[in-house]
A protein has these predicted regions:
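Alpha/propeptide regions of enzymes that mature by internal proteolysis
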Residues: 1-280
């Protein structure tokens, strides 16, 4: 499980902490058949927040819980408690504090979400997210990941989408819902993703002069996928039954997303960078 792999610093065990050096996790889940949702935000010291979010989706009300309320629920349901702050994450934190002090860099460096949209053989679409959020965020900060329509959305009659990037900006466009809405109107997933990212990127730049990172992935009810981004080297994976998983890179070139297969060299370098010793 990605949430359990300590070298992915944007999610679960090994995720980067907030400004108080505490790991706060967010996760969300949606079933496109029944439209049920579940989400947790600001939850501490639980190993797999996406599983807690899925369990919450079984409830008609009280299906989105935060902080202490989410932790009490998880304990009652028997979910595993685990200290999520690793020694490696502490090293990242100390290094960033030093860089902020000595180089006047911004503390908010590093944000990513593990998002997934899946279609099964019966036509059911689900979407989910899990993240430790913005590195050195303020305690209690919540981004788009656990917000239905922002970080994730699923409708089995149409498709599903998930998003990653700067949560405060992604939420402003209800970006995952907007992609699914466009697909419902007849757009394919690639066009829906590209148009939605373009529109939000342009609106943010018009209103304040810049846009944060915006990256999205979607599938339609027929299993076609799309991806769009306003950054460089956004990676995503496509997996089909009885096939090997394929890693792709998306790059924003002249305002449009160009998707290419990731080379083995790129994937090796990716893992080397994540597992390399940290120099403080």
């Amino acid at each position: 499980c990605v949430e359990d792999f300590p070298y992915y610093k944007s999610v679960g065990y090994g995720g980067l902490p907030n400004e108080e050096m505490i790991v706060e996790l967010d996760a969300g889940y949606m079933d496109g058949n029944t439209m049920v949702i579940g989400a947790v935000a600001g939850i501490k010291d639980f190993a797999n927040p996406i599983s807690i979010a899925k369990e919450l989706s079984k409830d008609t009300v009280n299906c989105v819980l935060v902080a202490e309320g989410a932790e009490k629920y998880a304990s009652k349901k028997g979910f595993e408690r685990k200290t999520m702050l690793t020694d490696r994450a502490k090293q990242h934190y100390r290094k960033r504090v030093k860089e902020v002090r000595e180089q006047e860099l911004k503390p908010y460096d590093g944000h990513d979400t593990v998002g997934e949209v899946a279609l099964d053989c019966a036509g059911k679409i689900v979407a989910g997210t899990s993240t430790s959020g913005l590195f050195m965020k303020k305690a209690g900060r919540i981004g788009d990941s656990p917000i239905v329509g922002g970080g994730f959305y699923a409708d089995s009659e149409v498709g599903g989408a998930t998003a990653t990037g700067l949560g405060e900006d992604l939420m402003k466009g209800c970006i995952s819902y907007e992609i699914v809405r466009k697909m419902k109107e007849g757009m394919g997933p690639q066009e829906a993703c590209q148009r939605t990212v373009d529109e939000l990127d342009a609106k943010l730049k018009k209103s304040r002069g810049f846009a944060g990172d915006l990256s999205v992935v979607a599938i339609d009810k027929d299993g076609n996928y799309g991806c769009a981004t306003n950054i460089q080297n956004f990676s995503f994976v496509i997996y089909r039954e009885n096939e090997e998983a394929k890693v792709y890179l998306a790059n924003c070139i002249d305002g449009k997303t160009v998707i290419t297969a990731a080379s083995q060299e790129w994937m090796d370098q990716y893992m080397q960078e994540r597992m390399a010793p940290i120099s403080e």
